[in-house]
């Protein structure tokens, strides 16, 4: 989900 993108940062 979108939250994964934040962790990928």
From Swiss-Prot:
| Subcellular localization, as worded in the UniProt entry | Secreted
Q: Does the keyword GTP-binding apply?
A: no
* Listed GO CC annotations: extracellular region
Q: Which domain of life is it from?
A: Eukaryota
Asked if the record carries the keyword Secreted, the reply is yes
GO BP annotations listed: neuropeptide signaling pathway
Any idea which UniProt keywords this protein has? Amidation, Neuropeptide, Secreted
Residues modified to Leucine amide: 9
**Function according to Swiss-Prot or TrEMBL:** FMRFamides and FMRFamide-like peptides are neuropeptides.
- Indicate the family of this protein: Belongs to the FARP (FMRF amide related peptide) family.
**What is the protein name for this chain?**
Extended FMRFamide-3
- Recorded source organism is Tyrannophasma gladiator (Gladiator)
